[in-house]
């Protein structure tokens, strides 16, 4: 039996490439915050030893910026609460407006620097 894809389904993210991108975003996060044993949500600065409660979020949308899909600099680490909160607040408006992420993160200078690198 085949199931229909929902109207929001974006197609396969290329499992291996996506997993590699996600891993690289988390490793970059550890280097940027200077903590070798921890990952950090950039909104709340909460340290985590595991990635189970964290998400890698694309700064420039997966849909609209295909050339940046697998660029590890096009990702930030957010806790699940922040990640879901961002998408609840901005829905699809954020797809072509990466600056909405900065707005959501309160325009924090450290966050601006983090995203610019």
Go through each PLM region and give its residues.
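Short Cys/His-centered divalent metal-binding micro-motifs
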Residues: 75-97
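Short cysteine/histidine-rich metal-coordination sites, predominantly Zn2+-binding motifs
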Residues: 58-64, 94-104
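Short Fe-S-cluster ligation motifs
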Residues: 75-80, 107-117
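Short, cysteine/histidine-rich loop/knuckle motifs that typically chelate Zn2+
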Residues: 40-45, 81
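Short, charged surface segments at domain edges that flank catalytic/cofactor-binding sites
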Residues: 2-40, 67-69
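Short, non-ligating residues that shape and space the ligands of small metal-coordination modules
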Residues: 50-54, 88-89
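Short linker/helix segments within small regulatory modules
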Residues: 60-74
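Histidine-centered catalytic micro-motifs used for acid/base chemistry in nuclease
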Residues: 41-43, 52-63
């Amino acid at each position: 039996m085949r199931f229909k894809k929902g109207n929001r389904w974006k197609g396969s993210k290329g499992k291996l490439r996506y997993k590699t991108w996600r891993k690289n975003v988390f490793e970059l996060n550890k280097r940027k915050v200077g903590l070798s044993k921890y990952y950090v949500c950039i909104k709340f600065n909460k340290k985590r030893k595991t990635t189970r409660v964290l998400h890698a979020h694309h700064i420039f949308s997966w849909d609209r910026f295909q050339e940046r899909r697998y660029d590890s600099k096009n990702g930030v680490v957010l806790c699940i609460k922040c990640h879901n909160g961002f998408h609840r607040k901005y829905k699809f408006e954020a797809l072509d407006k990466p600056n909405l992420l900065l707005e959501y993160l309160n325009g924090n200078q450290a966050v601006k620097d983090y995203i610019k690198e």
